[in-house]
C-alpha cells in the first residue's frame, strides 16, 4: 500500500533564511534602469538614450552615473539624498536650464561633475553648496551670462574649473578667490568686455597665468571704445590706469546719498539757527524796554 504524504511547507525560519539569501544575492537597490547598462555593481551607463528625466530606479549605492547625451532638464532636488555614494556624474549634453537651491544636498562624496553642453544661464549664490569634495567641475559650453560671487563657496577641494565657451562678459574675482585649491581654470571662449569692471579680473589673471592651460593668447576681450577684440597678452595694467580714477556705480550711490544727507542736515541746522535768532530778536526789545523803564524810575 502506498501512502500519500502531503508536501511539507517551509517553516518560518527556513522562509526567512531563503529571503535573506535572495536579498544578499540581489544586493541593496540592484535594479538597473530599462535601456541602461550596469557594467559593474557601482556603475550605471545611460548615455545617448533620449531620456527626458534622470532614470529611475537604479542602484542606491551607485558611484558612477553616466547620463550624457539625453534630454534631461533638471536634477531632482532629492537626488543626492538617495544616492549619497555618487562620486562621478557625467551630465554633459543635456537640457539642464538651472540649478535649484539644495540640488546638491547630500552630495558629500561627489568628486567629478560634468555639466558642460547644457543650457545654464546663471549661477546663484551657493549653487554647489554641500558638494565640498568636488575636485573637477565643468560648466563649459553653456550659456552662462552671470556667476554670483558666492557661487563656488564651500568648494575648498576644487582643483579644476571650466567656464570656457559661455556668454560671460565679466566675473567677480571673489568667485575665484573662494577656491583655495584651484590649479586649473578655463576662461577662454567668452565675450569678455575690457572695461573697468574687468580690471580686477585682469589683475587676477596676470597673477595666476600658470593656472590657464591655454595661456593669455586664448582669452580675448572687446575694447569699449573700439570695435575689435584683443588677446589679453596685448594688454597690461597700464591699459586700465584710468580705472583707478573712475567711480563704480556703488561709489556714485554713496556719494549721492552722502550729499543728500549733508544737504538735509544743513537745512535742518539752518532752520534751527534761524528759529533761535528769531526768538532772541523777539526777546531782546522787551529787555531793552525794561531797562529804559528802570532808568526812568531812577
From Swiss-Prot:
InterPro entries: Cys-rich_flank_reg_C, Leu-rich_rpt, Leu-rich_rpt_typical-subtyp, LRR_dom_sf, LRR_TM_domain-containing, LRRNT
Pfam families the UniProt entry points to: LRR_8
Biological process annotations from GO: potassium ion transmembrane transport
Gene Ontology, cellular component aspect: voltage-gated potassium channel complex
Domain (LRRCT) ranges: 190-245
Keywords attached to this entry: Cell membrane, Disulfide bond, Glycoprotein, Ion channel, Ion transport, Leucine-rich repeat, Membrane, Repeat, Signal, Transmembrane, Transmembrane helix, Transport
Ranges in the topological domain labelled Cytoplasmic: 273-298
Residues with attached carbohydrate: 119
Transmembrane segments: 252-272
SMART domains for the chain: LRR_TYP, LRRCT, LRRNT
Disulphide bridges, residue numbers: 32-38, 36-46, 194-221, 196-243
Extracellular side of membrane: 32-251
Bilayer disposition of the protein: Single-pass type I membrane protein
One example GO MF annotation: potassium channel activator activity
Mapped LRR repeat ranges: 61-82, 85-106, 109-130, 133-154, 157-177
SUPFAM superfamilies the UniProt entry points to: L domain-like
Top-rank taxon, per record: Eukaryota
The LRRNT domain, residue ranges: 32-60
Subcellular location: Cell membrane
Function: Auxiliary protein of the large-conductance, voltage and calcium-activated potassium channel (BK alpha). Modulates gating properties by producing a marked shift in the BK channel's voltage dependence of activation in the hyperpolarizing direction, and in the absence of calcium.
Oligomeric and partner information: Interacts with KCNMA1.
Domain notes: The transmembrane domain is necessary for interaction with KCNMA1.
PANTHER family attached to this UniProt entry: ANTIGEN BSP, PUTATIVE-RELATED (PTHR24369), CHAOPTIN-RELATED (PTHR24369:SF210)
Protein name, per record: Leucine-rich repeat-containing protein 38
Source organism: Mus musculus (Mouse)
Taxonomic classification: Eukaryota, Metazoa, Chordata, Craniata, Vertebrata
Gene: Lrrc38
